[in-house]
Regions:
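Small-aliphatic-rich amphipathic alpha-helix that forms the alpha element of a beta-alpha
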Residues: 36, 102, 118-169
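Short connector loops at helix/strand junctions that flank enzyme active sites
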Residues: 45-47, 95-100, 182
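Glycine-rich, charged/polar anion/phosphate-binding loops
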Residues: 34-37, 85-90, 170-173
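A glycine-rich helix N-cap at a beta->alpha junction
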Residues: 71-81, 171-191
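Specificity-determining recognition surfaces
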Residues: 1-31, 46, 177-191
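Short secondary-structure boundary segments
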Residues: 106, 160-161, 191
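Glycine/small-residue-rich phosphate/adenosyl-binding loop
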Residues: 52-137
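Glycine-rich phosphate/pyrophosphate-binding beta-alpha loops
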Residues: 37-44
Length: 191
């Protein structure tokens, strides 16, 4: 593939929030998630896990948790903020309409730059807001979005469900993911 072809492919990919009522085959889900294996990460840690959900009842339950947590904030907020959040609510729960959501989890950062400096007695910069695992998640999510596009699907990367219901979603899905992982992103996939 030449650079112009690749650039056009990148330009074609866009985020979508509305989906046709079409399912996604298990084979396509596996192929899309398999593309994540080839994502570079710091020290090749590949600090991510995925939970793919096609069950509409479960998708709706997760969306309900996000909206319920948002609504629980309303009594403590000024009316104009509540009105703004009500308009914004669609973006928090539009994943209800997706035939597939991929929840992205990453390991909890337990080895900081400070510890590396201490353990190896070397001078390193102490970058602000540096989290190797989250940088890797950004790369892996992008690969999944591009894989969706290549497979003929549309997708959207969401982080707001994390803001409003991270702990509740982690608790609800604890049988699928280890304790040392945090829910950090959600990807919707459909046609």
């Amino acid at each position: 593939m030449d650079l112009n072809t690749f650039k056009n492919f990148l330009i074609k990919r866009a985020s979508h929030s509305k989906f046709k009522d079409e399912g996604i085959t298990k084979e396509d889900i596996t192929k899309i998630v398999d593309c994540a294996r080839f994502t570079p990460s710091g020290h090749n840690q590949q600090p991510w896990k995925f939970v793919a959900v096609t069950d509409k009842k479960l998708i709706n339950t997760l969306a309900d948790k996000v909206i319920s947590n948002l609504a629980s904030l309303y009594p403590s907020l000024p009316e104009e903020t509540v009105n703004m959040l009500e308009k914004y609510k669609f973006f928090l729960e539009h994943f209800r309409g997706a035939p597939l959501i991929i929840l992205v989890f990453t390991t909890k950062n337990d080895y900081t730059t400070s510890e590396i400096k201490r353990d190896f007695n070397i001078k390193l910069a102490e970058p602000k807001h540096f989290d190797m695992e989250l940088l890797g998640v950004g790369a892996v999510v992008n690969n999944i979005l591009l894989a969706c596009e290549a497979a003929g699907y549309v997708s959207c990367w969401l982080t707001e469900p994390v803001v409003y219901a991270q702990k509740e979603i982690e608790e609800y899905l604890k049988e699928y993911i280890e304790d040392n992982y945090n829910f950090v992103s959600l990807i919707t996939v459909g046609r």
